[in-house]
Amino acid sequence: MQVTKLNTQSILPLTCSRSGTCCFGKTVMLNPWELLSFSKEKKITSREFRDLYCEFGGIRLRFNGKPDKKGQQACSQYVDNIGCSVHLGRPLACRLYPLGRQIQSNKAHYIHQGDTFPCLTDCSEVLDLPKLSLGEYLKGQEADPFEKAQDEYLIVMQNIADIAF
């Protein structure tokens, strides 16, 4: 699949309509810091959050909620007519959606899949909302501490992998 690279000045239809379309049928991987952020917002322990709302020992958010019109399961944190029940504690993947972030040569790059902006298919109403620069979007999503946590976690995982060989 084609990947479109972006820069912080890229202007995109990033104002969220809060329709919840992105909360269905996804795979959201979590790092330990995100698991902790979720549990704090839910006011339960990390272990309780992991056991109730995650799969594979806490590394993947469970999508076992009510299905949408396409038959895709809702995120375990999604509430009809409200949205994310733990919005302030949401992980980096949700903060960046529909964008992705990849690290190459120790530099972060923001991307989206395909040559057409992903939200336009299921959330065409975003075209009627104000467009934002990628930099403005990231600031509004408060992504920075989550990016730092993700970067540090990736270093730890790489070090573990290096030790194995």
Place the predicted regions along the sequence by residue.
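Short loop/turn segments that flank or connect secondary-structure elements
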Residues: 1-165
